[in-house]
């Protein structure tokens, strides 16, 4: 979901 995308991007930082 959208939240999964956000958390995924933050995890890449």
From Swiss-Prot:
Q: Keywords on this record?
A: Amidation, Amphibian defense peptide, Secreted
The record's account of tissue expression is: Expressed by the skin dorsal glands.
Q: Which GO terms describe its biological process?
A: defense response
Its source organism is Litoria ewingii (Southern brown tree frog)
The GO cellular component terms are: extracellular region
Write down what this protein is called: Caeridin-7.1
Protein's UniProt keywords contain Secreted: yes
Primary site of residence = secreted
Q: Which residues carry this modification: Leucine amide?
A: 13
Role according to the record: Caeridins show neither neuropeptide activity nor antibiotic activity.
Protein's cellular compartments: Secreted
């Amino acid at each position: 979901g959208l939240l999964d995308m956000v958390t995924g991007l933050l995890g890449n930082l």
